[in-house]
């Protein structure tokens, strides 16, 4: 097994920190994150629900939760769902930890990961997730950088491996080229079916969608969000 080193070190901060953290945020990074962070150096449990303190009925993954607006909203809506949140940027992780310090009950059905989501996807057991959310990922708008986009054949294979049959992959973006890119890859993948009846469905937010600061900015700049859902066959 490849050893995964903790990311809370000088390299992590130099690469992934934006604004300077407040003292209480630094404290949570040092004390609460090690408790909730998934250690990939340990074998994945055969029953992934054992990761959580609370008894959970299903498990969902959010990749790149940013400031945590959507993930916090979903945790409050679904207290019997276990959530795994991935965010490699320290400022977003710090905001999430501040929320968890205030709403301590959610610590019992949330686990975190602060590095590359592909490492976590490779660690997870087969068919262990009920859903995966990827909202407003970095679009890498320059064509020469499109190969860096998170949606690619290898990652779709990863999603297919860890999702249960009938599990949902949800994707939102305000960048047309990334929406088209995502549709192309998913509709050409043997393991996924696009859940849409009419083009109008693309523009309808998910039920009780809380929106995010990034989405609000996109709307102010006249970029129209698109919401896609794909089902694991």
From Swiss-Prot:
Q: What name appears for this protein in its UniProt entry?
A: tRNA (guanine-N(7)-)-methyltransferase
The organism of origin for this protein: Bartonella bacilliformis (strain ATCC 35685 / KC583 / Herrer 020/F12,63)
* Chemical reaction(s) catalysed: guanosine(46) in tRNA + S-adenosyl-L-methionine = N(7)-methylguanosine(46) in tRNA + S-adenosyl-L-homocysteine
For the keyword Methyltransferase, the answer is: yes
Q: Where is the signal peptide?
A: none
Q: What function does this protein fulfil?
A: Catalyzes the formation of N(7)-methylguanine at position 46 (m7G46) in tRNA.
This protein's GO cellular component annotations are:
tRNA methyltransferase complex
Q: Where on this chain does substrate bind?
A: 142, 174, 212-215
Q: What residues form the membrane-spanning segments?
A: none
Q: Which UniProt keywords apply?
A: Methyltransferase, S-adenosyl-L-methionine, Transferase, tRNA processing
Matching HAMAP family? tRNA_methyltr_TrmB (MF_01057)
The pathway it acts in is: tRNA modification; N(7)-methylguanine-tRNA biosynthesis
């Amino acid at each position: 097994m490849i050893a995964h080193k903790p990311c809370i070190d000088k390299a992590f901060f130099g690469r992934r920190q934006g604004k300077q953290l407040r003292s209480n945020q630094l404290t949570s990074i040092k004390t609460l994150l090690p408790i909730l962070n998934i250690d990939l150096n340990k074998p994945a449990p055969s029953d992934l629900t054992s990761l959580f303190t609370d008894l959970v009925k299903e498990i969902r993954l959010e990749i790149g939760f940013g400031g945590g607006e959507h993930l916090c909203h979903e945790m409050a809506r679904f207290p019997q769902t276990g959530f795994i949140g991935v965010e490699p940027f320290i400022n977003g992780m710090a905001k999430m930890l501040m929320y968890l310090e205030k709403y301590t009950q959610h610590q019992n059905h949330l686990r975190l990961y602060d590095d590359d989501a592909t490492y976590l996807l490779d660690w997870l057991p087969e068919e262990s997730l009920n859903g995966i959310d990827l909202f407003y990922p970095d679009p890498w708008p320059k064509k020469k950088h499109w190969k860096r986009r998170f949606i690619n054949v290898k990652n779709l294979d990863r999603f297919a491996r860890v999702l249960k049959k009938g599990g949902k992959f949800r994707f939102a973006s305000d960048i047309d080229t990334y929406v088209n890119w995502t549709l192309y890859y998913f509709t050409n993948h043997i393991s996924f079916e696009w859940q849409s009846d009419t083009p109008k469905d693309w523009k309808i937010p998910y039920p009780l969608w809380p929106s995010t600061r990034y989405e609000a900015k996109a709307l102010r700049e006249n970029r129209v969000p698109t919401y896609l859902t794909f089902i694991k066959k």
